[in-house]
């Protein structure tokens, strides 16, 4: 029973590896989201004896490279809702300043305490995540398009003020 808690940030993560009763197998350390670092963590996990579960908090899109990497390697990966993690942190005995190292320890502890309730990530969620990302991009580009049209209208209104019915190019 080994819980790998990963506190994901933009471009880097903090990793802590715990066994039951708070036994720290690997002190919290930082790693980048590059292939080299992910392979190094994979090698470290392969050397460990016991069932391994990787636990991370959902962070918009930042957790996706790590999630995809370990899911494709066949690991049990669980993505936790940030609200559930916040509630757990509030009820947890780990208090004090909020740091990435403490967060990774808390996430690993969550994995140990909720071991049998953890839900394994399913691959088809990738499709929904990609659709969500594409939807966000579409909305963003539509907002840019509308702003550009509004700006063009303002420029035409200012420059063609003497013409009663301006011919618009759109």
Please give the residue ranges for each predicted region:
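Anion (oxyanion) recognition and catalysis
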Residues: 71
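Amphipathic alpha-helical coiled-coil segments
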Residues: 131-148, 152-155
């Amino acid at each position: 029973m080994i819980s790998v808690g990963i506190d994901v940030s933009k471009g880097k993560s903090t990793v802590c590896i715990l066994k039951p009763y708070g036994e720290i197998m690997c002190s919290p350390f930082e790693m980048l989201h590059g292939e080299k670092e992910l392979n190094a963590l994979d090698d470290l996990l392969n050397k460990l004896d016991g069932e391994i579960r990787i636990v991370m908090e959902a962070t918009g899109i930042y957790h996706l490279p790590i999630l995809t990497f370990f899911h494709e390697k066949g690991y049990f990966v669980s993505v936790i809702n940030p609200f559930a993690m916040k509630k757990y942190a509030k009820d947890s005995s780990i208090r004090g300043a909020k740091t990435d190292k403490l967060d990774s320890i808390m996430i690993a502890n969550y994995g140990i305490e909720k071991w049998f309730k953890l839900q394994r990530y399913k691959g088809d969620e990738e499709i929904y995540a990609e659709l969500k990302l594409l939807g966000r991009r579409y909305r963003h580009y539509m907002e840019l398009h509308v702003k550009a049209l509004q700006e063009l209208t303002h420029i035409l209104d200012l420059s063609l003020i003497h013409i009663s019915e301006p011919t618009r190019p759109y």
